[in-house]
UniProtKB/Swiss-Prot annotation:
This is Probable 2-keto-3-deoxyxylonate dehydratase. GO terms for molecular function: lyase activity; metal ion binding. Keywords: Carbohydrate metabolism, Lyase, Magnesium, Metal-binding, Plasmid. The keyword Glycoprotein does not apply. The gene is xacE. Gene3D superfamilies: Fumarylacetoacetase-like, C-terminal domain (3.90.850.10). Mg(2+) binds at residues 144, 146, 164. Disruption phenotype: Impairs growth on D-xylose as sole energy and carbon substrate. It comes from Haloferax volcanii (strain ATCC 29605 / DSM 3757 / JCM 8879 / NBRC 14742 / NCIMB 2012 / VKM B-1768 / DS2) (Halobacterium volcanii). Induction: Transcriptionally up-regulated by both L-arabinose and D-xylose via the pentose-specific regulator XacR. Its EC number is 4.2.1.141.
């Protein structure tokens, strides 16, 4: 199923979509207002998220897609968002080109241990339709479309779409500047929904595309497939959870293979659409922070 978190008249609500019908699960159980609530109760009941949701749909109100789009927020209240780097060959090549120390990216691409780094807190993460940010002290910024792994207590409970906005100029000055290039206000967006593993036959065989518009014209449009990843989702989760007390809910962004080439620079007023097969489209405008 596809799960959306909504904010309606100041209240949280959770919906589930199946066979072109969307159900307001909160109307069936007022205690279930977030995806985390549903996953927690499913775990206690020793059932799957989808099975519990299916039972709730019998007593739930039906809502239309326009209602969901109008009120959608981030699809999961992740306490932490992490990201993986150099998981596609093209990202390794792009970071070599930008860096004063290119060999280190080639080494990570072929290493046993993946690059996994902290990306965002809830306050730095924007919802679908809101504006992602580019740093005012950066000269070269790019959106990075990525498959997001949704975790509950370190276990995969779903997938979403993520945008890992990055300053390539700051990271390119020195790899030690990576936290400043990656972590700042409005540096990340996830959405529009969480899709459970039961509805994703293979997360490593998903079409992914990104379109960027400026002043009403498309200035970037490209597509790829997650089959180009050199790391598996299970591998990234394994390294994330090793010797690490992980939060109740977290998201891992799995890296990108769609990298706009120079002289492209993400600017205030641009509009970014990222689509992943079977999940949906994450749309954001751009602002300067």
């Amino acid at each position: 199923m596809h799960y959306h978190q909504l904010a309606v008249s100041g209240e949280r609500r959770l919906t589930a979509s199946r066979d072109s019908t969307t159900y307001d699960l909160t109307s069936a159980d007022a205690d279930l207002r977030t995806f985390g609530d549903l996953a927690r109760v499913a775990s206690i009941a020793r059932t799957s998220v989808d099975r519990l949701a299916a039972e709730l749909t019998e007593d739930a109100d039906v809502v239309d897609d326009a209602f969901v789009d109008r009120h959608a927020t981030v699809p999961v209240d992740a306490e932490e968002i992490w990201a993986a780097g150099v998981t596609y060959q093209i990202s390794e090549q792009a970071r070599e080109e930008e860096s004063s120390m290119p060999d280190m990216y080639f080494d990570v691409y072929d290493a046993d241990r993946p690059e996994v780094f902290f990306k965002a807190t809830p306050s730095r993460t924007v919802e679908p339709g809101d504006a992602i940010g580019v740093r005012g002290d950066s000269e070269w910024d790019v959106p990075e479309p990525e498959l997001g792994i949704v975790l509950r207590r370190g276990e995969i409970v779903g997938y979403t779409v993520g945008n890992d906005v990055s300053s390539r100029s700051i990271e390119g000055e020195n790899p030690l500047y990576l936290p400043q290039a990656k972590v700042y206000d409005r540096c990340c967006s996830i959405g529009p929904c969480v899709v459970t593993p039961e509805d994703v036959e293979d997360p490593h065989e998903l079409e992914m595309s990104m379109t960027i518009e400026r002043d009403g014209e498309v200035i970037y449009d490209d597509a790829t497939n997650t089959s180009e990843m050199v790391r598996s989702c299970d591998e990234l989760v394994s390294y994330f959870t090793r010797h690490n007390t992980v939060p109740e809910l977290a998201v891992i962004l799995t890296g990108t293979s769609l990298v706009p080439e120079q002289p492209f620079d993400l600017q205030e007023g641009d509009h970014v659409d990222i689509t992943i097969e079977g999940i949906g489209t994450l749309s954001n405008s751009v602002t300067t922070v």
